[in-house]
């Protein structure tokens, strides 16, 4: 089977890897000059398998109103003329109930835990390195109210058998001694000892190189113009003015996926959630994080690589704008100075932004569509790095008609019922096109 993958971020690249291993002929196209140069380039570096949570959570609507007036708000909204922005926000608000939060988090945990297993197996098989650390993640709570609110997450962690530790302020220093030098006295923390860290860009680049050795063809500098449709089937894509035919097309274009699908009558509720990062040269290892921490108040993570510190987070709903907002840099600098003062050189920091493809419920969209031969792997939001290996392996099983190792419930686009065309029975999510 010839598979055409549109997008060479971490999602497209892991999809290519697993489809190649399944025996498919794989071609990957991307508009950039190499793999992982957009949203995968400088994300937070956290492999948050256990911390996985949707942004749509109880209390967020009221917090969002308050955040409108805060300089360092973790979530901000910049109105645009795009009606999709308001439709997406309305859908997200509907998922902020405790009931929906539990359902969505459960789906996300299912995929994240599977992704942990997939990455472990991939790493053991290939020996791939990406400045990874297996020292856990710590969620920091500045207030007792935040700590108390973590109870609902702890209940789901217990349900899924995910190890965790609730840390007192005194216990924090055992795992992250550098916090002692900070100006914040935290109320407590939640530690997930099995979570990991690593550079997503390094992983994507190196996995692409390994996939190329297996015969996967990567074509860069390619503009994907539209999908080719023949009746109920997608038969390829127009790229740089030429038709590239394939038995199966995988759309892994992140936030840009809905733009390609719209002409087919598919209204995919994926919208860009703009994130920011600041990468600092490490100047004092004793003041740096041992692994990674997430400041719950600002939704900012501070992560250690070999010789660098990555400070990343926040979310800005502002359409497809990729300009660098100096106020967001100020927030990142404030947080790292609060928690790990003197760990990195702020003067030489690399400020970056990326558009994270978010769904209203937080769960990505992986699987079949109403069109035969067209599959999706997109909408991972802030957790593309975390979910990438599991998403790629799961998708390869679907496309190649192999039994999936996890439930497909709630993972494909049919949960939204937003297509303007009927879904053919032979193209149900659990019945991929015949190879």
UniProtKB/Swiss-Prot annotation:
Sequence positions that bind FAD: 3-17
The protein's required cofactors: FAD
Metabolic or biological pathway, per its Swiss-Prot or TrEMBL entry: Amino-acid degradation; D-alanine degradation; NH(3) and pyruvate from D-alanine: step 1/1
Cystine crosslinks: none
Coiled coil residues, start to end: none
Membership in a protein family: Belongs to the DadA oxidoreductase family.
Protein's name according to its UniProt entry: D-amino acid dehydrogenase
Lineage of origin: Bacteria, Pseudomonadati, Pseudomonadota, Gammaproteobacteria, Lysobacterales
